[in-house]
UniProtKB/Swiss-Prot annotation:
Major location (coarse): cytoplasm
UniProt organism field: Shigella sonnei (strain Ss046)
Annotated family: Belongs to the transaldolase family. Type 1 subfamily.
Gene: tal2
Name of protein: Transaldolase 2
Active site: 131 (schiff-base intermediate with substrate)
An annotated Gene Ontology molecular function: transaldolase activity
Length: 316
């Protein structure tokens, strides 16, 4: 049995890609997209019809060019998501504009709009996850959306404080990042030789997984942002893992026994009182890595969102 099939015995595998053909090849349960992945996919000629449709929608649904570009971007994200849902049996994650990461109300408004666009294409909201950055405002937006039956995927998660606040808000799913945590520590104190058990990104997800299970939180833990297959194999047993096509390929090509590494702890504890905003900000602020990586992640997604807007604006 190849490693990918081995992992699928214990974990729900999700494709981290906007490339529909790549997703088709690996038979994942779900798929995740973000502005960077959409930008990459939008540059491929086979998806030109999705862009043309989004452009036509933008022209029809915006008065100014700025409004047309925003409308086209939203429609493009939904077009890709709807196509992906023809392939995966589960859900697709679609991201709210990263520039709204510190605005609860506008994040809620954008999320509702994206869900509405999906529903206009005949996609039920039960098949959509709305991705929001794990800022205090993003978590509060998700808390309200969950009450409306709009499930959320809280992304750019680097600290335990973020994970705890998400669970306390009752969000559907979190995406704790492994590779970007590894990158931060590797740049400062390189691990040579590499020991997966000491990988700070792997340890972060394990800690969150154990805490959630010990306190009976129902929020799904989906490890994300991997740099190497060892990180993925070390988290086998995690609720879900979202994996890029290049790493799915490596796992599919290697035949090796896969052992479950994450198992819910037998000991359980009562849940603590929910964190206040002040506690959240203080705890998150204790970790330079988490502060830097959350800020950087938001900036990078915003840059790619602007590039996507520029690409569409040139076609309007």
């Amino acid at each position: 049995m190849n490693e990918l099939d081995g992992i699928k015995q214990f974990t729900t595998v999700v494709a981290d890609s906007g490339d529909i053909e790549s997703i088709r090849h690996y038979h994942p349960q779900d798929a995740t997209t973000n502005p960077s992945l959409l930008l990459k996919a939008a540059g491929l000629s086979q998806y030109e019809h999705l862009i043309d449709d989004a452009i036509a929608w933008g022209k029809k649904n915006g008065k100014t060019q700025e409004q047309q570009v925003v409308a086209a971007c939203d429609k493009l994200a939904v077009n890709f998501g709807a196509e992906i849902l023809k392939i995966v049996p589960g859900r697709v994650s679609t991201e709210v504009d990263a520039r709204l990461s510190f605005d609860k109300e506008k994040s809620i408004e954008k999320a509702r709009h994206l869900v509405d666009l999906y529903q206009q294409q005949g996609v039920e909201k039960s098949r959509i996850l709305i991705k929001l950055a794990s800022t205090w405002e993003g978590i509060r937006a998700a808390e309200e959306l969950e009450k409306e039956g709009i499930n959320c995927n809280l992304t750019l998660l680097f600290s335990f404080a973020q994970a705890r606040a998400c669970a306390e808000a009752g969000v559907f799913l979190i995406s704790p990042f492994v590779g970007r945590i590894y990158d931060w520590y590797q740049a400062r104190k390189p691990m040579d030789p590499y020991v997966v058990e000491e990988d700070p990104g792997v340890k972060s997800v394990r800690n969150i997984y154990d805490y959630y299970k010990q306190h009976h939180y129902e929020t799904i833990v989906m490890g994300a942002s991997f740099r190497r297959t060892e990180q993925i194999l070390a988290l086998t047993g995690c609720d879900r893992l979202t994996i890029a096509p290049n790493l799915l390929k490596e796992l599919q090509e290697k035949v090796s026994p896969v052992v479950r590494k994450l198992i819910p702890p037998s000991q359980t504890f009562p849940r603590p009182a929910p964190m206040s905003e002040a506690e959240f900000r203080w705890e998150h602020n204790q970790y330079a890595m988490a502060v830097e990586k959350l800020s950087e992640g938001i900036r990078l997604f915003a840059v790619d969102q602007r590039k996507l807007e520029d690409l569409l604006a040139a076609k309007l």
